[in-house]
Amino acid sequence: MSAAEDTRSKTDDQLKDSLLELKKEQFNLRFQAASGQLENTARVRTVRREIARIKSVRGERNRAPQAK
């Protein structure tokens, strides 16, 4: 199962919680990068993409009832 399918299978509350958690992680990663303590630089990119994926799914769900 792809990451997008995993994200779509979550409920709205789970998506909200995941988004909040990822934003906190992104904040911490930004500070680690600024202070030179960041070891896994690829994690910044991964977190950013996961946030975008969640926002995309939430947008799809918001637009879906309007299309019908």
Swiss-Prot record:
Sorted alphabetically, the keyword list is: Ribonucleoprotein, Ribosomal protein
BP terms from Gene Ontology: translation
Q: List the molecular function annotations (GO) for this entry.
A: structural constituent of ribosome
Q: So which residues are the signal peptide here?
A: none
Query: Membrane-spanning regions, if any?
Result: none
Q: Which GO terms describe its cellular component?
A: cytosolic large ribosomal subunit
Q: Which residues form a coiled coil?
A: none
Classification via InterPro entries: Ribosomal_protein_uL29, Ribosomal_uL29, Ribosomal_uL29_CS, Ribosomal_uL29_sf
Q: CDD domains in the record, alphabetically?
A: Ribosomal_L29_HIP
Q: Which family does it belong to?
A: Belongs to the universal ribosomal protein uL29 family.
List the NCBIfam families hit by this protein, alphabetically: L29
What protein am I looking at?
A: Large ribosomal subunit protein uL29
Source organism of this protein record: Rhodospirillum rubrum (strain ATCC 11170 / ATH 1.1.1 / DSM 467 / LMG 4362 / NCIMB 8255 / S1)
Tell me what gene encodes this: rpmC
